[in-house]
Amino acid sequence: MTYQLSKLRKAVLFFSALLLAAPAAAALGRDSLELTPPMGFMTWNKYKDDISEQLIRRIADRMVSTGYAEAGYKYIFIDDGWQGGRDKRNNIIPDPVKFPSGMKALADYVHSKGLLLGIYSDAARLTCAGYTGSYGFEKQDAKTFAEWGIDYLKYDYCHAPSDSAVAHQRYRKMGDALQDSGRKIALGVCEWGQLNPERWARQAGGSLWRVSYDVRDMWKDIVGQGGMGILDIIDITEPLYKYAGPGHWLDMDMLIVGLDGKGGPSSDLGGVGCTYTEYQTQMSMWCMFASPLAMSHDLLDENEATRRILLNKEMIAINQDAFGEAARRVDFPGVCRVYLRRLSGNRLALAVMNPSDKPQSIQLPLSVIGKAQKYAFRDVWEHKTALWQKTWQGDLQPHETKVFTVTAR
């Protein structure tokens, strides 16, 4: 195999410099709200707007009893459909049938489990599903969310002008309102990456921002209807790595691991389901890019294959690593893709992905990683360690991703 040596040398210099560099100082202001990517469960893909306080309580209980909370999944994100309009004073209220005890009581219950509660609204009069939005009531709603004990706001952009300056203004207004609410509430900018939020979302007070339209339960879009598969979102995220860091994250949308093509919004636009090899690749690359990890499968009826992927402590540790840098793709010839991410403790995370529909063999010169003669490769999925010199060799199944933590020896 012939390698593009000049490009590989550039990669060597870049990642050698990363290993020698000191971590950046802690981010200031709202950047300090989410110093590692938030993790939790989001209601939309499984339940859409068929949600209730009883369901949220069951999910909270389940997250604690099955080890998800201990693994780092701390948030329950209530998505669209909780709203019941506004009262006579224009205070936003929850649907009294779905949430008869009110949001404060629910937040208190979630907090009693050691978890955090997120909620949803929109930067327009109506939300994506046609419920009450927050446009024009930003300060009032932010104060209400604070009084309820909300910890996170997912703020959508349906029914709003397709203009970057307007989007920045609307998100900034809510970001300022949250900051003045008297409670620390993180802001998730859900604009879908169409108006370049990487350039303004952080300044608007966002702790994270979506990079794409909604993820669908598929490997990639093959029907041409605008659905986003796993590979489509990876492609979109690759060039955005430099915008990620502690307190400001690239949100690649929900994890579809374990949905199994069972319907709901994730099955729209060609979402027919994925193999567990593909689900494992989603977890791998979401962690490599330091994306938030929001589960969306049926927590109340899950299989062990799903749990094995979502509860992999070594993979989660990469996602939550204190350096907070997103992976960068190395310019490497051939079908397989190579990604590197700096980790604390003078380590690197290495991901090798086969995006093709055929098995692939790869020989990776270790000069891509650095100048050492020997490296210890810790296979994050197989939980095995091996020493490699000069070249790493491996075989990858279609759509498979292998992930290693790498240390010079």
Where are the regions that the model predicts?
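Bacterial N-terminal signal peptides
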Residues: A11-P23
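Structural recognition of the beta-strand scaffold that forms the well-ordered cores
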Residues: P37-T43, G72-D79, L116-S121, D151-D156, ...
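Aromatic-lined carbohydrate-binding/catalytic grooves of carbohydrate-active enzymes
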Residues: I59, M63-S164, R170
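Aromatic-lined carbohydrate-recognition surfaces of secreted/lumenal glycan-active proteins
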Residues: L115-Y131, Q179-N196
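Glycan-recognition surfaces
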Residues: F137, A186-D298
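Carbohydrate-binding surface patches
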Residues: Q280, W286-F289, A294-S296, F332-K371
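Catalytic cores of secreted or luminal carbohydrate-active enzymes
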Residues: T281-V330
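C-terminal beta-strand-rich structural cap/linker in extracellular carbohydrate-active enzymes
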Residues: W388-R409
